[in-house]
Amino acid sequence: MLKAIRRFFGEKASGQVARRRMQVVLMHDRMDLTPDIMEALRNDILAVISRYMEIDSRSIRVDLEQGKEYMALVSNIQIKRVYRKAAPDIRS
């Protein structure tokens, strides 16, 4: 039964998952993005988006994806609600 479900929905082989992880590590390395820089980027994105929306700060993911001709910064953030008016910018 489990085999049929996996065949129907598909399952990534552990080799594919490991390959994707290695690609992400290599992208970070090529761009010279240290874990500290990625964390700072995550925190900055969190601060800006928090002015406009209530979000689950524990759920934010920031990744780099690379296609044949591009590199993209992709974030996944759970939004709890959108504010009617933006919060004031506290950086000034």
From Swiss-Prot:
InterPro entries: MinE, MinE_sf
Domain of life (superkingdom): Bacteria
Keyword list, A-Z: Cell cycle, Cell division
One of the Pfam families matching this protein, by short name: MinE
Record flagged with keyword Ribosomal protein: no
BP GO annotations: cell division; regulation of division septum assembly
Known role: Prevents the cell division inhibition by proteins MinC and MinD at internal division sites while permitting inhibition at polar sites. This ensures cell division at the proper site by restricting the formation of a division septum at the midpoint of the long axis of the cell.
Family the UniProt entry places it in: Belongs to the MinE family.
Listed name of the protein: Cell division topological specificity factor
Species of provenance: Syntrophobacter fumaroxidans (strain DSM 10017 / MPOB)
